[in-house]
Amino acid sequence: MSYMIAVPDMLSSAAGDLASIGSSINASTRAAAAATTRLLPAAADEVSAHIAALFSGHGEGYQAIARQMAAFHDQFTLALTSSAGAYASAEATNVEQQVLGLINAPTQALLGRPLIGNGADGTAANPNGGAGGLLYGNGGNGFSQTTAGLTGGTGGSAGLIGNGGNGGAGGAGANGGAGGNGGWLYGSGGNGGAGGAGPAGAIGAPGVAGGAGGAGGSAGLFGNGGAGGAGGAGGQGGAGIGGADGTKGGDAGAGGAGGAGGWIHGHGGVGGDGGTGGQGGDGVQGEPGDTGAAGGAGGAGGRGGDGGSAGWLSGNGGDAGTGGGGGNAGNGGNGGSAGWLSGNGGTGGGGGTAGAGGQGGNGNSGIDPGNGGQGADTGNAGNGGHGGSAAKLFGDGGAGGAGGMGSTGGTGGGGGFGGGTGGNGGNGHAGGAGGSGGTAGLLGSGGSGGTGGDGGNGGLGAGSGAKGNGGNGGDGGKGGDAQLIGNGGNGGNGGKGGTGLMPGINGTGGAGGSRGQISGNPGTPGQ
């Protein structure tokens, strides 16, 4: 194999010489232009005129060729100059890598990580992200799985200064990876990876549960916590087989918790949202003389992740994630608490909306007609999360999350032709309760209570089937209390009852928070 050695300084010197030569040639060409392109005839006869024109044409041709050569010369000189710069840059890069290699070699040999540099991202073979340099560098990101059932890789942590790597997403039905921690002096935590969605169930089989979101990484002395990953959705349940009821949908994964903020200063990370529960499988038509099968229950929604707590000295608590919808909806996460000196509490997450009830199967038609199946009742709506507490000295409490809405009950199945009775509608469930507002610091106001969710409506009956009952409205959350100086938080309003054969009752409004001991106004109660 042959090798080429290039000396950047010599290339730069040669390019300068070429530029000087080109300038000299161009000056000579311009000086000769007047004497060679505009010749006067030696006499007034035609022969002299033709001779002058001939030599002037040769001069103009030379000038055209000279211009082309000058352009080529400029291009060649520019290419040589660029090559010299490229060789010099490559040489400098190699020197930098060699110096970093010498610096990192001792710690790499002793501790298995460099002194300076970013950690490697995870791969399918090694899904976890590598740690950043002990002195400086970010953690590598975790690998997002493409194979069902495999947990996402965790993000690598930083050393002294740097951000943690993000967690990888989980494969189908698997949890997301946690985010890496930020540098212990300065740096934010990495975000958690999302949970994988659960696959749908086959006929007669329930849906598969979704994976939970990964937790956000925590910061060190200064920095913000990473956000929690979202929970994966549950898979849809399979349809009933052989006259059986539809199967249950898969439960959703919970959202990951937000990471804690820096110990001296930093905000808590946001909690991840809970996943949506899988839809229940359909009920099938009944056999002759049998009642149609009921629809399957929806999977539970995932709980929203809690917001991360703030730094010990100052910082705001992280907002919580929202609960996922589903058969039984997920509750909202709680807001993160603020630091000791100053900061506001995080907002509580809203409760998830309950999944609608499945429709009942139709009765079989024929000589011995069957009755329609009853529509499925809805699940519970999620409660709102509580607001985070404020800092001990200065700060306001976080607002409570709103309760989830109740959903409509399932419609009854139609009776079989020839005398079958239609099924009754399913009952709507109660709305979720609102979360309580967070407590204030010595100087600050309490957080507002969350609003209660409205109750679900009763499902429609088929034919002569009765309509389902409405669900009650959720109660409003209590307002947060003030401490020394400040106003109490207002109570949340109660949700409205749902309509139905027996209408639901409206929820009760939450109590207002108490005023500060020295000054302030009490919170207004909810309606």
From Swiss-Prot:
Q: Where is the composition biased (Gly residues)?
A: 264-286, 292-384, 472-515
Residues in PE domain copies? 1-93
Q: Which Gene3D superfamilies match?
A: HP0062-like domain
Question: Which Pfam family, giving just one, matches this sequence?
Answer: PE
Matching SUPFAM superfamilies: PE/PPE dimer-like
Region (Disordered) residue ranges read 264-384, 472-527
Tell me its family: Belongs to the mycobacterial PE family. PGRS subfamily.
Identification of the protein by name: Uncharacterized PE-PGRS family protein PE_PGRS20
Species source reads Mycobacterium tuberculosis (strain CDC 1551 / Oshkosh)
Q: What is the lineage of its organism?
A: Bacteria, Bacillati, Actinomycetota, Actinomycetes, Mycobacteriales
Gene for this protein? Answer: PE_PGRS20
